[in-house]
Amino acid sequence: MAQFEWVHAAWLALAIVLEIIANVFLKFSDGFRRKIFGLLSLAAVLAAFSALSQAVKGIDLSVAYALWGGFGIAATLAAGWILFGQRLNRKGWIGLVLLLAGMIMVKLA
């Protein structure tokens, strides 16, 4: 692996934020009925993967992808709660805890 630098962590953080934005735009697109939000979602996904590609220059792919996916899911869940009133049931909370535990395990491996 290449030497870790904070710039790679910044790229990863940007990739996570862009993924969340893409998911919110996807919800706003209403199944691509509102095309502008659908196109914005696609652009945000493209930008997220571009940022992730920069992050993996200094972070192991398995770690970067696990963190990107895990934090993206957790933050999208929070965005759904705040913006759309979506709530998790007990199984959903258990799944989120397991997801976070898995991210920690991958990072420590």
Swiss-Prot record:
SUPFAM superfamilies: Multidrug resistance efflux transporter EmrE
Main subcellular location: membrane
Membrane topology: Multi-pass membrane protein
GO MF terms, alphabetically ordered: amino-acid betaine transmembrane transporter activity; antiporter activity; choline transmembrane transporter activity; spermidine transmembrane transporter activity
Alphabetical UniProt keywords: Cell inner membrane, Cell membrane, Membrane, Transmembrane, Transmembrane helix, Transport
Residues in the signal sequence: none
Regions crossing the membrane: 6-26, 36-56, 64-84, 88-108
Membrane topology, Cytoplasmic segments: 27-35, 85-87
InterPro entries: Small_drug/metabolite_transptr (IPR000390), Small_multidrug_res (IPR045324), Spermidine_export_MdtI (IPR023737)
One Pfam family in the UniProt entry: Multi_Drug_Res
GO biological process entries: glycine betaine transport
Family designation: Belongs to the drug/metabolite transporter (DMT) superfamily. Small multidrug resistance (SMR) (TC 2.A.7.1) family. MdtI subfamily.
Described function: Catalyzes the excretion of spermidine.
Subunit details: Forms a complex with MdtJ.
The protein's name in its UniProt record: Spermidine export protein MdtI
Organism of this sequence: Escherichia coli O6:H1 (strain CFT073 / ATCC 700928 / UPEC)
Gene field: mdtI
